[in-house]
């Protein structure tokens, strides 16, 4: 079994780690950074990932996709999706299956596809470091992700060419990294406020056993919402001062978003910051500039309710685990937003203790995923992880009631069966509708999917016995079966959301990804060939100017001809031709090298002679006769 990498697929940034010996290690990307922006852009037929996509976002807002994790596994009519539609500059569109997809460069992409591009970047980062192919990964998700979101994340891994050995909850991964090689027994809370989601998990750690007691959260609450509050504040202030609404200008919106994120980060360490955006827009009177002094107090006032929204899930998680706040011995902070002083203050106030700041909130989740990868491939042998399902699972029964089979915070993997019957006389088929959530009526919960059990022998209602079995695997993914006890007829399914990607769609996306990988590789080769050729043209022209007169007319003519031939193909898209002409010029320009060497050799003796002459000192002397 090869190396298993751990990937924190984040809303704002992503991170990859691997076990190196007995320690997990974060791997730096090609730019030398330990995290990679979770941003994809399409520009001039080229796909950009990470920092390169982020750099051009201001000039290409419509085709720059960020925070797609907030859309993954969601339906287009989801209120949370509608909320994001009014904020992001790119288009969120309805897919044929009803899911929320994104549109860029005149193409539609599923959130799983966009996530796959980020995962491919993480995979390449690991392969470059390890010098070997990587095919297996542990990928993290918010603890409060439902089945559809987990399935969609697993699909993203498959599209990226990865076998996803395990989907692991982010707070659990953080706890693994925190408690790794620590012997003390502790009850801890992991407070994870990231770029797009919030989770809190209560765990007991003892002798290498990490047992999740409960989890809670909000999959649509994170740093992006804090940025939006600042962005809207800037729009309001500018409108008040200039009478211009910037919310309809995609270019201005992208600049405002970047300024909001920057100001938010600065105010974690400073109490005031200046937001300066020259030439943000223009009207008949000329260009307009945005210049605002923004304070930490103003920021805290803008986002106070968002911070408060994280406290109720903490209260519920403690209640479900059967603990009081005073029972928690350590509170581990995870996610970039926990750097905000007001967030730390709220956590301290609720739990009654200073939160632990000894882990890097941007990296700890990836480190934990790498440790879990080590457990799965037997590199790490003294750890047992017991996670839970975040939401109750059940089916719709008579009257639209939600009947639970598995309660939230049940340790996984788990299996549970229950006997149901028919609602009508002589009913020969039943439809099993599977839901996930905490509401009493099925329609108020998340429909995960449905299937039919047919061929039930005709009988009065209430007589047939239909055994419904729920099986949740270690990834938190649901498998359901229904069996008629009389006939033995059985129907089994891995729940696929009412939307979601079909196997055929995933297969096509895998092929597209492989094709794109080949195209990306060819594009990279072309760019590298052009760069090498351009560099050679420059150096040849320079040396030809300096030493051209030392060449014979034949040699000089050969170099000039090869130089002209290379310059003529520089703008072409033919990598092989550019390489061929580069090699020809390299061979021809060897004559310049010989001329340079000869010229230097000839000047060397003369220089040495002059140096020696300088060392001779004329002196007066006289003979002294011996006495």
From Swiss-Prot:
Role summary: Acts as a chaperone.
Modified residues (Phosphothreonine): 197
Pfam families in the cross-refs: HSP70 (PF00012)
HAMAP family xrefs: DnaK
This protein's name: Chaperone protein DnaK
Bias (Low complexity): 599-610
CDD domains per UniProt: ASKHA_NBD_HSP70_HSPA9
Recorded family membership: Belongs to the heat shock protein 70 family.
Originating species: Rickettsia conorii (strain ATCC VR-613 / Malish 7)
Sequence segments annotated as region (Disordered): 597-627
Induction: By stress conditions e.g. heat shock.
Keyword flag Glycosyltransferase: no
UniProt keyword Phosphoprotein, yes or no: yes
Matches recorded under PANTHER family: HEAT SHOCK PROTEIN 70KDA
SUPFAM superfamilies in UniProt: Actin-like ATPase domain, Heat shock protein 70kD (HSP70), C-terminal subdomain, Heat shock protein 70kD (HSP70), peptide-binding domain
Molecular function GO terms recorded: ATP binding; ATP-dependent protein folding chaperone; unfolded protein binding
InterPro entries per record: ATPase_NBD, Chaperone_DnaK, Heat_shock_70_CS, HSP70_C_sf, HSP70_peptide-bd_sf, Hsp_70_fam
Gene: dnaK
Keyword terms, alphabetized: ATP-binding, Chaperone, Nucleotide-binding, Phosphoprotein, Stress response
Biased composition (Basic and acidic residues): 612-627
